[in-house]
Amino acid sequence: MERPPSRRARIAFALWVGVILIIVVPWYRWQGHTHWANVEWIPFSRPSYHVRDTVLNTLFYVPFGLLYRRMMPRHTLGAVVAAFLLSSATELTQVHSHGRFPSSTDVLSNSIGAWIGMRWYDARSDRATDAGPDLR
């Protein structure tokens, strides 16, 4: 039987989701109308695409994937699916902003970042298991 996630793991994950929401959702300059023309539907298709932004978006979701996997170790792709859903939701809020622009590049980068975090957690866990018991 699988152990439930520790309280510490759940709190760490919830805090990171909070950080994502605080940073990504446009809490100011909210408009009563949408800007669907500003949505980048096809990843990497805008001339304004910046490698730096993509790298930062990817790195921003690495802790999300790592903490999700720590909290739910048996859910293989759960971190990627959860990151995709959270990222899609936060990008969607930007449709109502004059200063932010929703981007499928961001959603893809965030999902890849979560996958990297999940794999990093797996690699760390495998090393700890391979090292054998702590005989101190």
PLM features: what roles do these ranges have?
Residues 1-136:
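Bulky hydrophobic segments
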